[in-house]
Curated annotation (Swiss-Prot):
Note: A single active site specifically recognizes both ATP and CTP and is responsible for their addition.
Name of the featured protein: CCA-adding enzyme
GO molecular function, one term: magnesium ion binding
EC number: 2.7.7.72
């Protein structure tokens, strides 16, 4: 049995000893059945939140309104959630009310897909009222109950379906795919931040091409930031050589290059990306758009290692030769890698010139930077001083 489950087992045992039901649920059970890496576990119980808090001496009210209490056990924290049913969904995301219950089956019934609606007890026996194991054997993503109802409860589940398709290399069952197509417009009610997280996970899966093809088939791109009308650009984009090691920066640079937006910054901001990511992708965009493979030393210097490495990575994904080693070697031959590496500072210039600070300092440092970079002069303080025409003291 997986060590993650064994370490968390005392939590289940304490709950059952107190007279309650308790199970491992959700993604951890699914991934166990798929022999995938498990990083953490979720625990569901018939104990109500206050009852959970009575059993464990160290708890935190992390989501108590929805029945979740974080329990500290053996120096680890575990989320323990009470079985619950949910009222109507008012915004295609959040239930209007949550009711705590004692029935495992009713709790599993509210979950998104059958493969995620399997529970495992303290004896590691599986409880699978919706045939999630069969779906896993058939490599099938199948909604629990009526697919349209599940998607209308939380529209993000449609994005999750396609993400799971990519991650697990599964396929959608017919009813789930039909419901996806029928309800796809509801995705516009989902926050961009949640969509962005799912997109990145999708792009790191082994079945990216199939996932994006399904996404395009149901016209999901219409409701993704900046991708409406970009079907013809996304078809070849899906065929690039993506893999799970792909970084987020490469994903966003690749998408920007594929759709060729006039304003890259606005496109990336629409996905609510961090400013650092937007800035880096912007710096690399023009190089990547042209598929730049061959660089002069000065180009490597002004682009910087992070940018030229990013451009090379997207080139490789598009089928070009990997030139990272030779680019790194050429970069290492540069006399300096940034202006900070210059042997002089603005303070030196002020001392030598004996005049007030002004724009002339930046202009002079730029001139020195260019001269050192072209190796017209050595990056040596005395040498630079003489070259600038200041006499030695």
């Amino acid at each position: 049995m997986n060590d993650v489950f064994l370490k968390a087992l005392p939590v289940l045992q304490k709950l059952t000893t107190a007279g309650f039901e308790a199970y491992f649920v959700g993604g951890s059970v699914r991934d166990y059945l798929l022999c995938r890496t498990i990083s953490d576990v979720d625990i569901a119980t018939s104990a109500f939140p206050e009852e959970v808090k009575e059993i464990f001496p160290s708890t935190y009210d992390t989501g108590i309104a929805h029945g979740t209490v974080t329990v500290r056990e053996n120096k680890e924290c575990y989320e323990v959630t009470t079985f619950r049913t949910e009222g109507t969904y008012e915004d295609f995301r959040r239930p209007s009310e949550v009711t705590f219950i004692r029935s495992l089956k009713e709790d599993l019934q509210r979950r998104d897909f059958t493969m995620n609606a399997i529970a495992m007890d303290e004896h590691f026996e599986l409880h699978d009222p919706f045939f999630g194991q069969l779906a896993i054997q058939n490599k099938e993503i199948k909604a629990v109950g009526k697919a349209s109802e599940r998607f209308q409860e939380d529209a993000l589940r449609m994005m999750r379906a396609v993400r799971f398709l990519s991650q697990l290399d599964f396929h959608l069952d017919k009813e789930t795919e039909n419901a996806l197509q029928k309800n796809i417009a509801l995705l516009q009610h989902t926050s961009v931040e949640r969509i962005t997280v799912e997109w990145v996970k999708l792009m790191k899966g082994p079945a990216v091409k199939r996932a994006i093809n399904v996404l395009l088939k149901v016209e999901m791109e219409t409701y993704l930031p900046g991708l409406k009308g970009e079907k013809s650009a996304l078809i070849p984009f899906a065929s690039w050589e993506w893999d799970k090691r792909t970084t987020e920066n490469v994903i966003w640079l690749g998408l920007a290059v594929a759709v060729k937006k006039a304003n890259v910054t606005s496109f990336l901001k629409a996905w609510k990306l961090p400013n650092k990511t937007i800035q880096l992708v912007n710096q690399a965009y023009q190089y990547a758009l042209n598929g730049k493979e061959y660089w002069q030393k000065e180009e490597l210097y002004y682009a910087g290692k992070e940018v030229f490495s990013l451009v090379n990575e997207i080139n490789v994904i598009r089928g070009q030769e990997n030139k990272q080693n030779e680019l790194d070697q050429l970069y290492e031959t540069l006399p300096i890698h940034s202006k900070k590496d210059l042997a002089i500072t603005g303070g030196d210039l002020l001392e030598w010139a004996d005049k007030s600070a002004g724009p002339w300092i930046k202009d002079t440092l730029d001139k020195v930077e260019s001269a050192v970079l072209s190796q017209a002069i050595n990056n040596d303080k005395k040498h630079i001083k003489r070259w600038l025409g200041y006499h030695e003291e």
